[in-house]
Amino acid sequence: MEATIVCIDNSEWTRSGDYAPTRFQAQADAVNLLAGAKTQANPENTVGVLTMAGKNPRVLVTPTPDLGKVLNCMTDIVIEGEANITSAVQIAQLALKHRQNKNQRQRIVIFAGSPVQEDKVGDTKRISMHSSQQSAPRGMRSSQQRPLWYTCCSCS
């Protein structure tokens, strides 16, 4: 059982046509595939969607088993500004913290269609490892812990 938040890059970089038809559409197709696979794998799996660009990252859909809600929210996304991965991960962690089923494993999937600065990657890793250490069961060493996030797609 998993609760997954998919972080979508809706920055200006995703207008690029180097992936047919655009980087953004390639992400939308990947979200469709990922959300479908997650919800079919286990009926208790949930998927949520968060945008990373604009004024602030925004949760479009909280984790839900309803594939239709996930797919519908993709049509309303506005491409604007620059992606803020660090803030997006923090907001995704909050959304996962308040999930309905606390027995679900937490997973954050990040689609990056824009360049990611080296220092931002370090900040994001630090945030994910810090939250992993806070939520680790007693007796678990830090070497046994896995960070909550991983980059699934980088189109830059």
Regions found by a protein language model. Give the residues of each.
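Von Willebrand factor
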Residues: 1-111, 116-119, ...
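P/S/T/G-enriched low-complexity
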Residues: 8, 134-135, 146, 150, ...
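Charged, surface-exposed interaction regions in soluble eukaryotic proteins
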Residues: 112-146
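Beta-strand elements of modular eukaryotic interaction domains
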Residues: 15-17, 35-40, 48, 79, ...
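Amphipathic alpha-helical interaction motifs in eukaryotic regulatory proteins
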Residues: 11-12, 28-36, 71, 75, ...
